[in-house]
Amino acid sequence: LHLLSRRQRQMCIRDRISGADLPIQPPEDIRAFFEANPDKEFVHFDPHPFSPFNDERVYYRHFFQNIDLRRHPVLGVINGILLSGQKLLRIKRNQDVHFTKGSQWFSCTDGFARYLLTKEEWVLQVLDKTFCSDEFFVQTLIAQSPYQDKIYQGPGDTSARAIDWDRGNPWVWKYADLEQLKASPCMFARKFDIEKEPELVHEIERLYAPHI
């Protein structure tokens, strides 16, 4: 939210991308695409049913969000005990919230960015100690907002990003996927790993991002 606030004066369409993302269209086509869709919100929604694991993420508190529990196994055990205790005592929060989930990488209009900023108190109250809350807050808020009807519904994913959730979490694109990426109507793609697939990354950069 604060990152969006700092960027408010920079551009009308705000893109949230990571270092594992690359453009898969020429810069002029990306610019033309967003200019042709100036009032659309590009937000991904998980098409799969809400799983018991996701229920656990949003309805119970996870007390060590800022700690990598894989490196601190004792805290991982404590976290599991606290989680089991909440279930045993039926301490289930947020039961009045209809959660939706998707990728945290999105592009949005200035209007929706400002709308998100007005919801900071709600985010802190509802999503504090939620496990990976960045996969819930944008989708949940936009689905219950005046911007719901502005979600992009054109070719490809609603986020304008080619992300393969069927083969991975997400799938790391391979060189064998190059033709699939070239045929995609999306503007960006993720996830790329230059250590594992340097040939693919360099080819994508050569085709679509020679300035990088």
Regions found by a protein language model. Name each.
Residues 24-59:
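Conserved donor-nucleotide/metal-binding helix-loop-beta segment in metal-dependent transferases, i.e.
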Residues 125-212:
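C-terminal catalytic/acceptor-binding lobe
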